[in-house]
Amino acid sequence: MRIVFAGTPEPAVPSLERLIRSPRHDVVAVITRPDAVAGRGRKVVRSPIGALADSHGIEVLTPERPTEPEFLARLTDLAPDCAPVVAYGALLPQKVLDIPAHGWVNLHFSLLPAWRGAAPVQAAIGAGDDMTGASAFRLEAGMDTGPVYGVVTERIRDTDTAGDLLGRLADSGAALLESVLDGIEDGAITAVPQPAEGVSHAAKVTVEAARIRWDRPAAVVDRHVRSVTPGPGAWTTIGDVRLKVGPVTPTDERLEPGEISVTKSGFLIGTSTAAVRLDRVQPQGKKQMAALDWARGARLDAEVRAQ
């Protein structure tokens, strides 16, 4: 099939790589978000999908808005049979959805209808789910509401960060997406409507939402930290210092919520149940470092609390 692929960040790369290698499909163009300015040097940076397409000589479309007449005209001229989508980063209007002959197939990193929305992997870890997966579904106007072609499942490990889990789902989801496109071409696959039960929503994780609440149980704090790692990153304030917090480990020691203990065994902070031991921290504007080294160097007042 003639394929136009839409995607932007690194988790979309395995899917595009598989489709480029596929002997059955021809990726004639990709759609990705416009180049961004990033870093201290304020350099213009191509999205991972745009960079991959460039390396293979594939046409790259970067509309500011998918309603632009020039974009609509070019997409129509490309005459795609199908358009797979993986984390593109913008909603597509109906006039765009209507262009491919077989529609758009979205790869979403949850077992729909669970965790519809922008941050399904983060939500699944934060909620303490044992299992998640990826769903390939036909894109429609609603938010992740279209009928599902197929799914793959993935167990959530006790130490998984969002980055760990998303990496595995990106790989297994890529294989699913290729299989679904093969089935669509063969006329051998049918999309099944999502059930009305089991719907949940995963809003985008803001920096404020990533702040650690020390009045919650240790297990919840641990899941929260892992769910927002690597980005936007869990954080807290201690005195007048804002710290990004890396992995934490629940312990058997008891401290009051936010209470701090610095001993040979580690840098501990209390929760509503047991204390957790901090592994790595990153003071704002500085490099990541061992949490115990930071705490010893900070010479914390006995009354200071994590907020």
Swiss-Prot record:
Family annotation (Gene3D superfamilies): 3.40.50.12230
Pfam family, one: Formyl_trans_N
Positions of (6S)-5,6,7,8-tetrahydrofolate binding: S110, L111, L112, P113
Enzyme Commission numbers on file: 2.1.2.9
Top-rank EC class of the record's enzyme: transferase
Keywords: Protein biosynthesis, Transferase
Catalytic activity line of the entry: L-methionyl-tRNA(fMet) + (6R)-10-formyltetrahydrofolate = N-formyl-L-methionyl-tRNA(fMet) + (6S)-5,6,7,8-tetrahydrofolate + H(+)
InterPro entries hit by this protein: Fmt, Formyl_trans_C, Formyl_transf_N, Formyl_transf_N_sf, Formyl_transferase-like_C_sf, Met-tRNA-FMT_C, Met-tRNA-FMT_N
Coiled-coil features, chain-numbered ranges: none
Gene Ontology terms for molecular function: methionyl-tRNA formyltransferase activity
GO CC field: cytosol
Domain of life: Bacteria
UniProt xrefs under PANTHER family: METHIONYL-TRNA FORMYLTRANSFERASE (PTHR11138), METHIONYL-TRNA FORMYLTRANSFERASE, MITOCHONDRIAL (PTHR11138:SF5)
Protein family according to the UniProt entry: Belongs to the Fmt family.
Job of this protein: Attaches a formyl group to the free amino group of methionyl-tRNA(fMet). The formyl group appears to play a dual role in the initiator identity of N-formylmethionyl-tRNA by promoting its recognition by IF2 and preventing the misappropriation of this tRNA by the elongation apparatus.
Name this polypeptide is given: Methionyl-tRNA formyltransferase
Source organism (scientific name): Rhodococcus opacus (strain B4)
Phylogenetic lineage: Bacteria, Bacillati, Actinomycetota, Actinomycetes, Mycobacteriales
